[in-house]
Every structure is written in structure tokens, then in C-alpha cells.
Regions:
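The conserved phosphate-sensing helix
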Residues: 529-546
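Short glycine-rich substrate-engagement loop in P-loop NTPases that contacts/grips substrate
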Residues: 359-389
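Walker A/P-loop nucleotide-binding motif
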Residues: 328-346
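Extended, charged/polar low-complexity intrinsically disordered regions
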Residues: 1-326, 541-577
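Alpha-helical propensity feature that highlights long, continuous alpha-helices across diverse contexts
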Residues: 569-730
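Hydrophobic positions on the alpha1 helix immediately C-terminal to the Walker A/P-loop
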Residues: 347, 351
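Conserved catalytic/switch belt of AAA+ P-loop NTPases
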Residues: 408-434, 442
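A short helix-turn-beta junction within AAA+ P-loop NTPase domains corresponding to the substrate/partner-engaging
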Residues: 358, 433, 447-480
């Protein structure tokens, strides 16, 4: 049974409607609070169990009238059974003394002023929770929690985990095995026993769908949460109207790098082969799969799923919005960094296009030879600012280039314009006016790279003074890996590749927007190590390939190697083209070697896999090919390359630690494959029932079983030798 106590309110609005061409208005009332939830859930109210505090109903106001000071919730606890739920709803109309205790489970929807009540509760050690708090993250912030908002879902989640360990959230929530924290109407964090789960709308930030200050919205969200709890379904993906994704949050103390933890990495960054398969689907079928599961942001034609880029873009957007609305007469100064061709100006321009009201100016400082040219640029900006039709958005490309032979020589010339909004013209000080300055790095690939230059040189060039005047910066990740730990660059590359194909080679798309591309070319485009000129090099492959009139991008339509080598390592790229075929050949040879060894041990061995490759079940063929491809991709993580065998080269030997890690990875791969195919653990192997005794963690394997995985890795050396290739440490 459900019991409802707490605040209720009637909100009266006037709604216009058309009656035979005549506009009329009618009174529409909405019941909020405890009674509103009971009404939404279709409950027949028991007056003895429901205490309703009637509120003002004037106009569109709600809340206890100021002259009433109701400080207690009351309920006859004798009416509440151990299996009952008490729904307590707080409209924050008055401070309270306590939360009533019952023998059932209380779901307490509390607001900021009464969160302190959660600190004083004494709980029994029972399997069924006595009290389930349902509160908002905003109210935790009001009570002093240091938790960011609307920067990224990851940042908010990690800040909350930190506060739950060390901050006010620990005092308020840590004792409760079950609680719900609302992230406006765009997400929620749920704790159930030892598991914390983030539910979120991938394409939005906290607050995009509306504020919980709107009590009608809060009532609707809380009603669905209560419905999921009392029904025992706990399907919190149904709480909000938009599609919700979910991510189990890590234990904060076990996080090695909280600032770089990302949902994209958690979902797709664990296994390189899985990343590649996901990237292939993005290029061929579109981004829907990934956009429905990981955080993203979109401004015009710009779309990203990279946490660092999302946080930077949103911070820049907030700065530009605020500047557009305020009255500051000095320019807003921003900086953007990235590898050549990473799209530094593209992102900012798309943001400006989305926000509207900007006029774009571009100046390349590396092409300026005198201060006079910069003065002319400032005058053009000043004229546009005085005109006032649109706000000047000014790109100073390669601002970190040398001037008059002095490294970073341009920096000091911008100090006065950035600080005071003035420049010198013919010896006179002139006002620049309102503008947004965007300094795009030419030699510095990141902000950290820019400020970590030779410090004597940096100070001499007034670098610290320049940095102190910046209001924000943006690091563009681009299509190349930014570090050894960057595993999901292939996802970024796939999204860029699809957008470039749609823009420059529409004929490759069928009626379902499916890209027709040879799997070998796609694999090479996604996995080649580096594009020498970033996204421009990727675009080159499309523009220089003879695709006009072609419906499919096949290997015969690639650019000449001489042109290709300008943008990638052509030899490496072409070797990638053959990897899939190579893996099939390696899988075939591997199976025949395995067959030969097994039959030598037991000539009449009765196993499904003991048959020649041509007669082998397709499931086993795919498994063997996937195994080869998996290890070829894993070699990248260990700086192991593949090349044509040389007559004078020494025999390759794995480092001991690499051999162990690769063997452990092979066992993990095999377990995942078997589990996905429906196999389960059992002490005795049974192929028909799909039972296998080796479906256990590596540490629980016998030495004999471990050696089998080690032998799989060692056999790879022989396999490559048979096809005229060899492994080597790069």
C-alpha cells in the first residue's frame, strides 16, 4: 500500500482556446506535491494516511501562505505495514523538524532547506531500505557541494563521486544504500547498494530540458521514479521522456585519472578490435548507435563525442553567450590549439554560426611583416564594432609564430588590446570596441604545449602576461591519436570520415544513407597511424580518389602512392589494405597447424573444430580470423610492427612481460567470445550444452591452461614466417 504525506498545492492558470472563431479563456488547475503524485498514480486517497497542507491558489502561485508555519509532517505509523511505502513530498514551504519513522519504506522527495534532515536519520541494518532520498543535484550545490554543472556528464559524475567521499554529499547521503539524485530533467544518479549508475540524455547537458524549479516538471519526474521503485522494476531509463543511456560509475578511490575518465572510453575504448568494428559501423551506417549511448555535443556541422572537446566547447559557448549579453567594451580573448589540419577554426566558426550575430575576420600573423599590417587589421575590427550590426569574431592564425626573428614575437603586441581594448595608430591610442579574439596556434599543438616552452624565452616574450589575459582555451583532438593512451581517436576519425564523404562524395551513399566502401580501404583509412596534415589529409583521400560517377569506393580507386605519401606513410597504408586478407590466411594456417598437432596426439579425436579449413564451420572460421585480427591490433599497444621478412634479421622474441600480457588478453578475448555465444562455466566440458571449465579469470587457470594461451601467442611468430613476414619492435 502507498501512503502520501507532505506538501500539496493547487496551481491555477488561464488557458486560451478558440470557440467558433472566438478566443476564450478557461481556468486550468494543476495539483502539485504529494496529492499531485497520488493523483498521477491513480491512487484512491486514504484521509488517515494522507496529510495535505492546502496552499494559496491565487493566479499561478503555489506554496504555503506566509502566515502559516507548518513545521511537522505527521502520519499515523500504525497504519503503515512493513511492505508499505510512504511517499513524502517537500515543496520547501517551511523548515521541518524531522522525517517521520515508520515500519515501511519512506521515499523522501526533499528540497534544499530540508536536506539537513537526512544527516540525522538513524537506520537499521535491514535488507529493505527504510528511507530512499530523492533529491536534486542543484539542492546539494545549494547546501555547499562543489559539483560542476552542464560542462560534461563525466565531470558532474566525477565531482559527485569526490563529494560523496569527502564533501557535504557524504554527510547527507553516504549512509543510504539507495538514493536518487536528479540532474534537472536530463539525467539522474542512482545508488543501489554498492552500485552507482548515471542515467543521462546523451545529446544534452544538465538543464537543457528544463529546470526542476518548475514544480510540474519535478512532480512528473518524481512520479515516475516512485513508480519504478514501488513496482520493483527499477527501470530508471523510463524516468525521463527522452532516450536515456546509462553508465555504471567507477569507485572513486580506484580511479587512476579522474580528469580523463570518459563514458566513451568505458563503452568503446577497452578493446581495439571492438573500437574498429564500431568505427566501421559509424562510417557505413551513421552515428546513431554511438550518439544514443555516449555524451555528445553539436553546434552546426560540428559534432563530437570526445569528453575533452565537449567540455572545452561548452565552456567556450558559455563565455561567448555571456560576452554577447554583457556590456564589457574590451575584447573577449580565447585561444585554440591543435595539430595542423585538426579543424581549429572550424569548431569556433560553427559555434558562432549556431549562436548567430557574429561577423568573421581571419588574419594570418605568420604572413604579416610589419606592425602596420596589424594596425590595419585592428582598424577593420574597430569599424565593424562601431557599425554594431554584428559582433566581430577575429581569428589571429599562427599567433605563436616568430616576428622580426623573435620567437613568440607577436605576443607582446596584443597585451594592450586584450587588457584595455586599445591599439596604437599613428602614435594615437584608439579604442577597438567589442570583439571576440580567437588566437589559433600554429606551432603549439595544445595549451599545455604552449605554456611549457623554454621558460626564459616564454617570459621574455611576455607569455605569462598573454596567458593571464585569456578567458578560455580549446584543445582540438583531431583525427590522430593525441597520446599512447588515446584509444578512441578511431571513433573521432570515423565520424569525420563519414561527414567528409557526405559532403564531398554523396554518390557513395545509397537510399538508406549507407556508405558503399570496400572493407579493406575502410580498415586502412581508420587504422593508419597518422594523417600528416590532420583532417585535411583525410579529405585529400576523397578529393584525389577518382570517385566521380562511382557508386562504391574500391581499392582500384585510390590516389597514386606518390600523392598518398604526402599525407600518410603510403607503405604502411597499403599494408593495412592487405591486413584483413592476411588475417584470413594466418587463421587458415593456424588452424591447419592446430589440426596437425591435435591429430598427432589423438588420431581419432572427436571435436567439432578438428576438420580441415575448407570443411570448417563458419562460426569457427570467423573465430579464428577474429583471433588473428585481435592480436594484430593488440601489437600496436606494445609497439610491435609487421614487415617483410629480411634474410639477415634476427628471429623475433617477445619480451617476457609482453608475452604474459598478450596471453592474458588472448584468454580474455576467448572468454568474451564464448560468453557472447552462450557458453557458461562448468567443471566438465560439454559442447552441446555449451559448458566449458576454462571460463574463469586468468588467475584461476591451471598452469597447463595458461600455457595454451601463451602457445597461441608464440605460434604467431611462426605464422608470419610462413607468409614471408616478421614481427619487430618499433
Amino acid at each position: 500500500m502507498l501512503h502520501f504525506i507532505g506538501d500539496s498545492a493547487k496551481r491555477i492558470n488561464w488557458q486560451s482556446y478558440c470557440d467558433n472563431g472566438v478566443t476564450r479563456v478557461k481556468e486550468v488547475s494543476t495539483i502539485l506535491g504529494a496529492m499531485g503524485i497520488a493523483q498521477k498514480m491513480g491512487m484512491e486517497l486514504d484521509d488517515k494516511a494522507l496529510v495535505t497542507l492546502v496552499c494559496s491558489d491565487k493566479g499561478d502561485t503555489y506554496g504555503i501562505p506566509a502566515n502559516e508555519n507548518v513545521i511537522e509532517w505527521s502520519i499515523d505509523s500504525r497504519q503503515v505495514g512493513t511492505e508499505d511505502f510512504v511517499i513524502l513530498y517537500d515543496l520547501d514551504v517551511a523548515p521541518r523538524w524531522q522525517i517521520p519513522k515508520t515500519s515501511g519504506t519512506t521515499i523522501a522527495c526533499l528540497k534544499a532547506r530540508n536536506l539537513h534532515l537526512l544527516k540525522n536519520m538513524t537506520l537499521k541494518d535491514a535488507k529493505k531500505p527504510e528511507l530512499i532520498p530523492v533529491i536534486s543535484m542543484n539542492d546539494l550545490r545549494t547546501n555547499g557541494a562543489s559539483i560542476s554543472k552542464a560542462i560534461s556528464w563525466e565531470r558532474t559524475a566525477i565531482d559527485f563521486l569526490r563529494d560523496l567521499h569527502y564533501g557535504i554529499s557524504r554527510e547527507i547521503l553516504d549512509r543510504y544504500p539507495f538514493f536518487v539524485v536528479l540532474l534537472e530533467a536530463d539525467g539522474l544518479i542512482v545508488r543501489q547498494q554498492d552500485t552507482l549508475t548515471l542515467y543521462f540524455i546523451p545529446s544534452k547537458a544538465e538543464g537543457d530540458s528544463g529546470s526542476l524549479e518548475n514544480e510540474e516538471l519535478r512532480n512528473s519526474v518524481c512520479t515516475e521514479i516512485i513508480r519504478q521503485i514501488v513496482s520493483g522494476k527499477y527501470d530508471f531509463t523510463r524516468v525521463l521522456p527522452d532516450t536515456l543511456s546509462m553508465q555504471v560509475l567507477p569507485c572513486y578511490e580506484e580511479l587512476e585519472a579522474p580528469e580523463s575518465w570518459s563514458i566513451l572510453n568505458e563503452k568503446y575504448g577497452r578493446d581495439r578490435l571492438e573500437i574498429i568494428e564500431t568505427a566501421k559501423r559509424i562510417v557505413i551506417h551513421g552515428e546513431k548507435e554511438i550518439l544514443n549511448s555516449v555524451p555528445s555535443c553539436k553546434y552546426g556541422a560540428l559534432q563530437t563525442v570526445d569528453r575533452m572537446e565537449i567540455e572545452s566547447y561548452r565552456a567556450i559557448v558559455n563565455l561567448m553567450k555571456k560576452y554577447a549579453q554583457d556590456k564589457d567594451t574590451r575584447p573577449l580573448s580565447l585561444a585554440v590549439f591543435g595539430f595542423p589540419g585538426s579543424g581549429k577554426s572550424f569548431g569556433i566558426k560553427q559555434i558562432a554560426k549556431t549562436l548567430g550575430g557574429f561577423e568573421i575576420f581571419v588574419y594570418n600573423l605568420s604572413q604579416f611583416t610589419s606592425l602596420r599590417e596589424l594596425e590595419v587589421a585592428f582598424q577593420e575590427i574597430r569599424d565593424a564594432s562601431i557599425k554594431g550590426e554584428r559582433l566581430p569574431l577575429v581569428f589571429f592564425d599562427e599567433f605563436d609564430s616568430s616576428f622580426n626573428g623573435e620567437p613568440l614575437g607577436w605576443l607582446k603586441t596584443f597585451l594592450a588590446p586584450m587588457q584595455d581594448g586599445v591599439f596604437m595608430e599613428d602614435g594615437r591610442e584608439r579604442q577597438i570596441g567589442r570583439a571576440v579574439f580567437v588566437f589559433a596556434g600554429g606551432t603549439s599543438t595544445s595549451f599545455q604545449n604552449f605554456i611549457s616552452q623554454d621558460q626564459n624565452l616564454f617570459r621574455k616574450a611576455k607569455g605569462p602576461d598573454f596567458v593571464s589575459r585569456l578567458k578560455g582555451y580549446l584543445n582540438i583532438q583531431g583525427p590522430n591519436p593525441t597520446s599512447k593512451e588515446d584509444k578512441v581517436y578511431i571513433i573521432r576519425r570515423a565520424m569525420l570520415l563519414r561527414s567528409l564523404i557526405i559532403r564531398n562524395a554523396k554518390q557513395l551513399l545509397d537510399s538508406d544513407m549507407r556508405v558503399n566502401i570496400d572493407e579493406n580501404i575502410l580498415y586502412a583509412l581508420l587504422t593508419t597511424e597518422t594523417y600528416r596534415h590532420g583532417s585535411r589529409s583525410l579529405e585529400f583521400f576523397i578529393s584525389m580518389s577518382p570517385l566521380l560517377g562511382e557508386k562504391k569506393w574500391s581499392s582500384s580507386l585510390l590516389p597514386p602512392r606518390s600523392q598518398m605519401d604526402i599525407h600518410v606513410d603510403a607503405e604502411e597504408f597499403m599494408s593495412k589494405i592487405t591486413i584483413l586478407a592476411m588475417c584470413k590466411e594466418l587463421a587458415k594456417i593456424s588452424h591447419e597447424m592446430y589440426l596437425e598437432a591435435e591429430l598427432a596426439k589423438t588420431p581419432n579425436k572427436d571435436l567439432q573444430a578438428v576438420t580441415h579449413w575448407e570443411n570448417l564451420n563458419e562460426t569457427y572460421k570467423k573465430s579464428n580470423i577474429a583471433q588473428m585480427q585481435y592480436h594484430v591490433e593488440r601489437f600496436n599497444d606494445f609497439c610491435i610492427g609487421i614487415r617483410q621478412k629480411s634474410p639477415n634479421s634476427e628471429k623475433f622474441t617477445f619480451k617476457d612481460e609482453d608475452l604474459l600480457k598478450l596471453a592474458m588478453a588472448e584468454h580474455e578475448r576467448w572468454c568474451k567470445e564464448r560468453i557472447a555465444d552462450g557458453w557458461v562455466y562448468g567443471e566438465k566440458r560439454d559442447n552441446e550444452k555449451k559448458i566449458h571449465p576454462s571460463l574463469v579469470p586468468w588467475e584461476q587457470l591451471s598452469e597447463e591452461e595458461k600455457q595454451k594461451d601463451i602457445d597461441v601467442i608464440l605460434r604467431i611468430i611462426t605464422l608470419f614466417d610462413r607468409i614471408g613476414l616478421e614481427l619487430y619492435y618499433k
